[in-house]
Swiss-Prot record:
<dbReference type="InterPro" id="IPR002915">
    <property type="entry name" value="DeoC/FbaB/LacD_aldolase"/>
</dbReference>
<protein>
    <recommendedName>
        <fullName>Deoxyribose-phosphate aldolase</fullName>
        <ecNumber>4.1.2.4</ecNumber>
    </recommendedName>
</protein>
<feature type="active site" description="Proton donor/acceptor">
    <location>
        <position position="185"/>
    </location>
</feature>
<dbReference type="InterPro" id="IPR028581">
    <property type="entry name" value="DeoC_typeI"/>
</dbReference>
<comment type="similarity">
    <text>Belongs to the DeoC/FbaB aldolase family. DeoC type 1 subfamily.</text>
</comment>
<comment type="pathway">
    <text>Carbohydrate degradation; 2-deoxy-D-ribose 1-phosphate degradation; D-glyceraldehyde 3-phosphate and acetaldehyde from 2-deoxy-alpha-D-ribose 1-phosphate: step 2/2.</text>
</comment>
<dbReference type="Pfam" id="PF01791">
    <property type="entry name" value="DeoC"/>
</dbReference>
<dbReference type="GO" id="GO:0005737">
    <property type="term" value="C:cytoplasm"/>
</dbReference>
<dbReference type="GO" id="GO:0016052">
    <property type="term" value="P:carbohydrate catabolic process"/>
</dbReference>
<keyword id="KW-0456">Lyase</keyword>
<dbReference type="InterPro" id="IPR011343">
    <property type="entry name" value="DeoC"/>
</dbReference>
<keyword id="KW-0704">Schiff base</keyword>
<comment type="function">
    <text>Catalyzes a reversible aldol reaction between acetaldehyde and D-glyceraldehyde 3-phosphate to generate 2-deoxy-D-ribose 5-phosphate.</text>
</comment>
<keyword id="KW-0963">Cytoplasm</keyword>
<dbReference type="GO" id="GO:0009264">
    <property type="term" value="P:deoxyribonucleotide catabolic process"/>
</dbReference>
<dbReference type="InterPro" id="IPR013785">
    <property type="entry name" value="Aldolase_TIM"/>
</dbReference>
<feature type="active site" description="Schiff-base intermediate with acetaldehyde">
    <location>
        <position position="156"/>
    </location>
</feature>
Length: 218
C-alpha cells in the first residue's frame, strides 16, 4: 500500500463561502506544521496564503470555474493567469458539467484543452474536476478520456459541492482510464485515515480534504 508521506499527498482544503481571513491564516499554519502538499482555497485568498506560505514548501492551490464549471472558457483562462500572478502554483478547474450531460463532448474538450494550455503556459499544475457524482459510468469514462487527451496533470473526482464525493470505485476506474500519464486526485467525503488510505490504495496520487489534520494525527 502506498502510505508513505500521507501528509505530502494532501491538499489542505477550505472552500466554504463563509470562510474568514482568520480561517485561511489558521489553515496555512496547519499546512506548514504538518507539511501538506498545498492549501486549496478560493481565489480571493491567494495573496494571503502565498505570503504566509512563502519558503515553507507548501504550495497554494485555487479553484477555477468553481463549483459549477459553467463559466465561459475565456473567463476560466483569465482566472488561471490571475491565479498565477497572485501566487497560486496549482489550479483545480471544473468541466462544464451541463455540456457533458448534454453529450456536447467537443465543447467540453475545447474548454478544458484551452485551460490546460493556459496553465502550462504559465507553469501551473492543473487538476480537472469532472464531478463524478453527477455523471453516468459512460460519461465518467468519456470525461476521463478527454482529460487525458488534454494533457492535464490530474483528473479530480469532485468539488464537494454536488452532494457526492470520491468513491474507491471511481478512483480505481479513473486510474485505469487515464493510465500513468495523468494523476488522480480524490476529493469529497475523505474525513478519516482509513478512507484516505483506501483512496491511495485505489490509485489516488493526491487527496483533497478539510480533515487533513485529523487524518494524519489519529
Amino acid at each position: 500500500m502506498r502510505t508513505m508521506n500521507l501528509a505530502g499527498m494532501i491538499d489542505h482544503t477550505l472552500l466554504k463561502p463563509e470562510a474568514t481571513e482568520k480561517d485561511i491564516v489558521n489553515l496555512c499554519h496547519e499546512a506548514k506544521q504538518h507539511k501538506f502538499a498545498t492549501v486549496c482555497i478560493n481565489p480571493a485568498y491567494i495573496c494571503t496564503a502565498a505570503k504566509l506560505l512563502h519558503g515553507s514548501g507548501v504550495g497554494v492551490a485555487t479553484v477555477i470555474g468553481f463549483p459549477l464549471g459553467a463559466t465561459m472558457t475565456e473567463i476560466k483562462v483569465q482566472e488561471i493567469f490571475a491565479a498565477k500572478a497572485h501566487g497560486a502554483r496549482e489550479v483545480d478547474i471544473v468541466i462544464n458539467i451541463g455540456w457533458a450531460k448534454s453529450g456536447n463532448w467537443e465543447a467540453v474538450a475545447k474548454d478544458i484543452t484551452r485551460a490546460v494550455e493556459a496553465a502550462h503556459c504559465c507553469g501551473v499544475t492543473i487538476k480537472v474536476i469532472i464531478e463524478t457524482s453527477l455523471l453516468t459510468e459512460e460519461e465518467k469514462q468519456k470525461a476521463a478520456e478527454i482529460v487525458k487527451a488534454s494533457g492535464a496533470d490530474y483528473i479530480k473526482t469532485s468539488t464537494g459541492f454536488a452532494g457526492g464525493g470520491a468513491t474507491v470505485e471511481d478512483v480505481r476506474n479513473l486510474k485505469a482510464w487515464v493510465g500513468q500519464s495523468v494523476k488522480v486526485k480524490a476529493s469529497g467525503g475523505i474525513r478519516s485515515r482509513e478512507t484516505a488510505l483506501q483512496m491511495v490504495e485505489a490509485g489516488a496520487d493526491r487527496l483533497g480534504t478539510s480533515s487533513g489534520v485529523q487524518i494524519i494525527t489519529v
